[in-house]
Design a protein with these regions (language model features):
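Glycine-rich loop-to-alpha-helix module at the N-terminal edge of alpha/beta enzyme cores
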Residues: 2, 46-133
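Conserved beta-strand scaffold positions in the cores of enzyme catalytic domains, especially
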Residues: 110, 136, 169-171
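Solvent-exposed alpha-helices and their adjacent loops that cap or buttress functional pockets
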Residues: 31-32, 102-105, 129-130, 162-166
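Conserved PLP-anchoring active-site segment centered on the Schiff-base-forming lysine
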Residues: 128-147
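Conserved beta-strand and immediately adjacent loop positions that scaffold enzyme active sites
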Residues: 36-38, 109, 135
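PLP-dependent aminotransferase-class I/II
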Residues: 34, 143-171
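Active-site-adjacent loop/helix segments that line or gate small-molecule/cofactor pockets in enzymes
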Residues: 1-35, 74-76, 95
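Active-site and channel-lining beta-strand-loop segments
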Residues: 28-51
């Protein structure tokens, strides 16, 4: 392990909050580059990324087509809070809704969110609000995210261990 990697690991231990992060190697692997489905360490050794950032980037790293579109959007209008409208948001919602109606025969609307755990949180709220019920079920062994609400419905000890038991809220 070279000095640069040692310094990164030391800074990680000193400055980064680990929360409920689980490292799959001890010491954790430090990656410096990526392409396609691979991550590369300081020696340019390729590692097949089975997680692909929790499936959020299953299009592959350094996808030129996607990078070009993202760069164009960042230059134009990088991000807006959800209460503001912009054409791209509405156009994407239309595409998704039309696809869902065509494929499944279901009309609906789109709720944009920042990630999977937040989507689980919002789903819990929608179900609770719509049904008035306070108990919900979740699948054994399922991963639902790391927010407090999502942790409440996971059976995984790894994600619940630091936050206590929420069995009164999920079955």
């Amino acid at each position: 392990m070279n000095q640069k990697i040692i310094e990164i690991l030391e800074k990680n231990n000193r400055y980064c909050s680990h929360g409920d992060t689980v490292n799959y190697a001890d010491p954790p692997k430090v990656f410096e580059d990526c392409e396609g489905s691979f991550l590369f360490d300081e020696n340019n050794t390729p590692y097949l990324d089975w997680q692909m950032w929790y499936s959020a980037v299953n299009f592959g790293y350094k996808n030129k087509r996607l990078s070009d579109v993202l760069h164009k959007q960042v230059d134009k209008l990088p991000q807006l809070a959800s209460q503001y409208l912009h054409k791209e948001k509405v156009d994407l919602a239309e595409i998704i809704c039309k696809y869902m109606e065509e494929k499944y025969g279901v009309k609906g609307r789109v709720h944009f969110n920042v990630g999977g755990a937040q989507a689980v949180e919002d789903s819990l709220k929608v179900v609770r609000n719509h049904t008035g019920k306070t108990h919900q079920f979740a699948f054994m062994g399922g991963y639902h995210g790391r927010t407090l609400g999502a942790s409440a419905i996971t059976s995984s000890y790894r994600y619940r261990r630091r936050f206590g038991n929420f069995s009164d809220r999920a079955h």
